[in-house]
């Protein structure tokens, strides 16, 4: 029987079980790294560094996890904070690397041309809309969970997702075959 995230967190808290935390990392590292790659506009090295920071912070601060939300929501919040702190330091000067976009493998988008256009369109969205769209549409968080991760009101998340999706549709339609 596979342990739940809550069971693993309990083992970390009670027994300081590093193997349990390792299992939490294994379960969530792909999603966290994927989110950070999108937020950093496909800068793989930076995203991986930020993911490592996020997991380290999660381990150091796991006693602050209150269980009010899923562990993954709490972890996404930490990862997003790492991104925001880094973006503030860099003033978000990260550009688009075309080769990395082409190597990006999104299982939902099999057409390389469409994947490229989608990545390009996502990178053109304002950060608040891009973050909400990525969390809700790509990472499968509910609007409520995304609001917790982004630390913004639920209505703002819904608005950002709606606006972001509408902008993506318009951009992709404009770039499509005529």
State where each predicted segment sits.
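N-terminal module of bacterial RNA polymerase sigma factors
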Residues: 1-26, 30-31, 170, 177
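Internal acidic/polar
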Residues: 2-7, 85, 91-115, 120
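Short, small-hydrophobic-rich alpha-helical interface motif
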Residues: 12, 32, 36, 47-58, ...
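Short, charged helix-capping/linker segments at alpha-helix termini
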Residues: 13-23, 34-53, 176-178
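Sigma70-family region 2
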Residues: 13-14, 38-42, 52-70, 89-91, ...
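Short helix-capping/turn signature of helix-turn-helix
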Residues: 27-30, 38-40, 134-141, 151
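Arg/Lys-rich amphipathic alpha helix in sigma70-family domain 2
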Residues: 60-67, 77-97, 163
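DNA-recognition helix of helix-turn-helix
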Residues: 84, 129, 138, 144, ...
């Amino acid at each position: 029987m596979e342990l739940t995230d809550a069971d693993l967190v309990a083992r970390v808290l009670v027994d300081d079980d590093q193997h349990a935390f390792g299992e939490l990392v294994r379960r969530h590292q792909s999603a966290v790294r994927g989110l950070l790659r999108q937020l950093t506009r496909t800068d793989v090295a930076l995203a991986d560094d930020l993911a490592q920071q996020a997991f380290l912070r999660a381990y150091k601060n796991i006693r602050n996890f209150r269980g009010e939300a899923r562990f993954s929501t709490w972890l996404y919040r930490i990862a997003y904070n790492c991104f925001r702190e880094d973006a503030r330091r860099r003033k978000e000067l990260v550009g688009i690397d075309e080769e990395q976009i082409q190597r990006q493998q999104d299982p939902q988008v099999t057409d390389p041309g469409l994947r490229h256009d989608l990545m390009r369109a996502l990178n053109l969205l304002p950060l608040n809309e891009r973050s909400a769209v990525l969390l809700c549409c790509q990472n499968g968080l509910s609007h409520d969970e995304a609001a917790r991760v982004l630390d913004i009101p639920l209505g703002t998340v819904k608005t950002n997702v709606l606006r972001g999706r509408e902008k993506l549709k318009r951009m992709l339609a404009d770039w499509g075959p005529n």
